[in-house]
Amino acid sequence: MTDPRFDPSRHIRAPRGNQLTCKSWLTEAAYRMIQNNLDAEVAEHPQSLVVYGGIGRAARNWECYDKILETLRRLEDDETLLVQSGKPVGVFKTHENAPRVLIANSNLVPHWANWEHFNELDKKGLMMYGQMTAGSWIYIGSQGIVQGTYETFFAVANQHFGGKPQGRWILTGGLGGMGGAQPLAATMAGFSMIAVECDETRIDFRLKTRYVDRKATTLDEALAIVEDAKQSGKAVSVGLLGNAADVFAELVARGITPDVVTDQTSAHDPVHGYLPQGWTVAQWRDKQKTAAAEITAAAKKSMAVQVRAMLTLQQRGAATLDYGNNIRQMALEEGVENAFDFPGFVPAYVRPLFCEGIGPFRWVALSGDPEDIYKTDQKVKELIPDDPHLHNWLDMAKERIAFQGLPARICWVGLKDRARLGQAFNEMVKNGELKAPIVIGRDHLDSGSVASPNRETESMRDGSDAVSDWPLLNALLNTAGGATWVSLHHGGGVGMGFSQHSGVVIVCDGTDAASERLGRVLRNDPGTGVMRHADAGYDIAVNCAREQGLDLPMLK
């Protein structure tokens, strides 16, 4: 039987320039961004519609993809397209300030919210796994998580090494769409890194895009490269071909302790995201369609081996953190009772930023011209002049990050800055400084847009880790505020049953109406994050809410 999700003839690239294919820039933005998600420079397996994160897709199948594009081309300025798990299911009359697209991906009634039920529906063609930015059409390649990873490693250096990471190294696993950001983020923060990856093509892709410096095929070779870099006073990243469980356990056996240990394999998806020990990549992929239960059992057993190694390395002095792929949960289910003894990265390092609504703000130049991004970089510096850490990030990003697909930038800013940046970008479009409109979005990993007890909302002060009202309110408010497209997903990052989250995208097309929408959406969206954390009792969030004039009725 032919797989409707695989088409080797597809080679997708988003349109560039300032000529419209659709009836307005609002629909043109969605039209270009879904295609950009599937650009070979951007996506992990574009001919299978897979963008990143195991099986995170942009559309349910190729028929649905084609119909989405066809519908966007004819969509009027007062109509809204509804997309259900990657399938365009309806167009309804709304109004000009309503979203042009509303997306719901991978959502299941809680009792049935597990991989087994999802996989049944997926096989029947009734669902699609949207991950976070795959199915919401705002993935920008590995840059999308570079700064968040950099900020985390920067915080690790400050907390554990007195702000001096030089000569120290990080051990991790996974060089996929998300994990591929780790090597560059590490060297930007001053650490060396060994990143274990079982798929050699992924290592080669990260070499090509300059996210990793070197490739090694043995642990000895990788260790030698890191040691040479230490002696020369430089930071280096190494993609090591191998199985993460094997390598982590081997380091324990040898008595070698890295300075920092983490993991970004796609452990959230035990069928498609984690190679079991003793299996070849070819065997693993061959069995994915026919032996899901066998793979799951073998993968979780191997995850337990890796997590036990991480716990041992933690006991030996390594700063050890979970990077949000749910590997601790998988190991716990496999009998590793103390799997959660090492913390997740959000409560350990990132939550103070979330309390101020600071998170992964990103924008894309629909013109396709990198100069538009460089001009917006400069505008950010002008509007936020007293933040040397942010300026340093922008300088490093310009120098070291290769654009994938349409030129884009990510920049962690919060409640006090997002709206004015968006409106400034809109003014640049209006006065012709930029060659075409800018589209602004963010990861679903943000301060007010996700409920994920093993990641973003782990160890909330008031115990509200699993309360998922917050991302629902976020999506509703962004819809009411006039975002260009809004998405509501389940299972991103940590897998089925473990998260709910929402996404938002808004277009700067240079119009006065856009400026008003930007002012609403880019204040409200991070404002819900400050609200959520203030409600949970975080003083930083309470103070931020007061300083920024948020109206929170229960705030004392």
UniProtKB/Swiss-Prot annotation:
SUPFAM superfamilies: Urocanase (SSF111326). Its EC number is 4.2.1.49. The active site is at 411. InterPro entries: Urocanase, Urocanase-like, Urocanase_C, Urocanase_central_sf, Urocanase_CS, Urocanase_N, Urocanase_Rossmann-like, Urocanase_sf. GO terms for molecular function: urocanate hydratase activity. PROSITE patterns: UROCANASE. Its main location: cytoplasm. Residues 455-464 have a biased composition (Basic and acidic residues). GO terms for biological process: L-histidine catabolic process to glutamate and formamide; L-histidine catabolic process to glutamate and formate. It catalyses: 4-imidazolone-5-propanoate = trans-urocanate + H2O. GO terms for cellular component: cytoplasm. Gene3D superfamilies: Urocanase like domains, Urocanase superfamily. Pathway: Amino-acid degradation; L-histidine degradation into L-glutamate; N-formimidoyl-L-glutamate from L-histidine: step 2/3. NAD(+) binds at residues 53-54, 131, 177-179, 197, 202, 243-244, 264-268, 274-275, 323, 493. Keywords: Cytoplasm, Histidine metabolism, Lyase, NAD. It is found in: Cytoplasm. Its cofactor is NAD(+). Binds 1 NAD(+) per subunit. Residues 445-464 are annotated as: Disordered. The keyword NAD applies. Catalyzes the conversion of urocanate to 4-imidazolone-5-propionate. NCBIfam families: hutU, PRK05414.1. Belongs to the urocanase family. This is Urocanate hydratase. It comes from Chromobacterium violaceum (strain ATCC 12472 / DSM 30191 / JCM 1249 / CCUG 213 / NBRC 12614 / NCIMB 9131 / NCTC 9757 / MK). The lineage of its organism: Bacteria, Pseudomonadati, Pseudomonadota, Betaproteobacteria, Neisseriales. The gene is hutU.
